[in-house]
């Protein structure tokens, strides 16, 4: 009988077959063996599996990519809200006392009273188109009342006003003037009577009349004239 020698690779296979191979090597060996048996069918199935896995991975990645973005936006919004809240708290802590101080300032109170009801308040100056928009329209009733008050005050001040530069008016003593005029008339009458009675005493009475006229003229101002002065001057002219 003839003995057939066994190939050497069979022994190696038996030796390596006893050892446990890792899962990755088993998968690679199985895939390679599967590809050798049926090249066309195996390659198509393997590619289909690979592409399906990749698409699954990509789909999972895409789904996972959308969620982290949303979470990041939510986190940013929450951080902004927290920052706003913290800034408001800090502002309230720091400026709560300042608001009362600003209200108590006399300058601010004076300005608020001065511009109260006269101008509009704009939060943004860019909203103002022209200067006319700043002025606030006045109520016609208030305007009429204000004008009436101004007219009353103007009338009172006009009648009660005195010019300090002008000299005060001196009172005129009318009684003294009347007495002087009476004396002049008596002197004239006595002079006429004496002229009729005697011619010697005529010159003396004329001198008395002239002295009286000069006396009255000394007391009276040059700017004031009376009818008695004209009569005296006419009499003097007639006598001369």
Swiss-Prot record:
Region: Kinase-inducible domain (KID), residue numbers:
202-229
Protein origin, superkingdom? Eukaryota
Show the segment(s) annotated as Disordered. 1-128, 163-207
Which locations, inside or outside the cell, does it occupy? Nucleus
Ranges of Acidic residues composition bias in the record: 70-84, 173-187
Q: Which residues carry this modification: Phosphoserine?
A: 213
Report the residue ranges where the short sequence motif Nuclear localization signal is annotated in this entry: 142-150
What residues does the record give for site: Critical for interaction with HDA19? 213
Q: Where does the UniProt entry say this protein principally localizes?
A: nucleus
GO-annotated biological processes: positive regulation of DNA-templated transcription; response to cadmium ion; response to oxidative stress
Q: Where is the composition biased (Polar residues)?
A: 51-66
Single GO cellular component term: nucleus
Compositional bias ranges of the Basic and acidic residues kind: 188-205
The alphabetical list of record keywords is: Activator, Nucleus, Phosphoprotein, Stress response, Transcription, Transcription regulation
- Give the function comment from the record: Transcription activator which may regulates gene expression through interaction with the histone deacetylase HDA19. Promotes slightly the tolerance to cadmium (Cd) and to oxidizing chemicals (e.g. diamide and tert-butyl hydroperoxide (t-BOOH)).
Report quaternary structure and partners. Interacts with HDA19; Ser-213 is critical for this interaction.
Please give the record's comment on domains.
The kinase-inducible domain (KID, 202-229) is required for interaction with HDA19.
What's this protein's name? Protein OXIDATIVE STRESS 3 LIKE 4
| The gene coding this protein | O3L4
């Amino acid at each position: 009988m003839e003995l057939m020698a066994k190939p050497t690779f069979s022994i190696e296979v038996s030796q390596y077959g006893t050892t446990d191979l890792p899962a990755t090597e088993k998968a690679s060996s199985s895939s390679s063996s599967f590809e050798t048996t049926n090249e066309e069918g195996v390659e198509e199935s393997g590619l289909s599996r690979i592409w399906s896995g990749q698409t699954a991975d990509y789909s999972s990645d895409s789904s996972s990519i959308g969620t982290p973005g949303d979470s990041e936006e939510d986190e940013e919004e929450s951080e902004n809200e927290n920052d706003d809240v913290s800034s408001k708290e800090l502002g309230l802590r720091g400026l709560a006392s300042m608001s009362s101080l600003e209200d108590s300032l006399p300058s601010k109170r004076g300005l608020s009273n001065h511009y109260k009801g006269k101008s509009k308040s704009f939060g943004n100056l860019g909203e103002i188109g022209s200067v006319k928009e700043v002025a606030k329209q006045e109520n016609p009733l208030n305007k009429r009342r204000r004008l009436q008050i101004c007219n009353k005050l103007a009338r009172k001040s006009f009648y009660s006003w005195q010019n300090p530069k002008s000299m005060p008016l001196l009172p005129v003593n009318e009684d003294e003037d009347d007495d002087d005029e009476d004396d002049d008339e008596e002197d004239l009458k006595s002079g006429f009577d004496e002229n009729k009675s005697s011619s010697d005493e005529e010159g003396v009475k004329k001198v008395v009349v002239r002295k009286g006229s000069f006396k009255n003229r000394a007391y009276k101002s040059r700017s004031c004239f009376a009818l008695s002065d004209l009569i005296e001057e006419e009499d003097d002219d007639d006598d001369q």
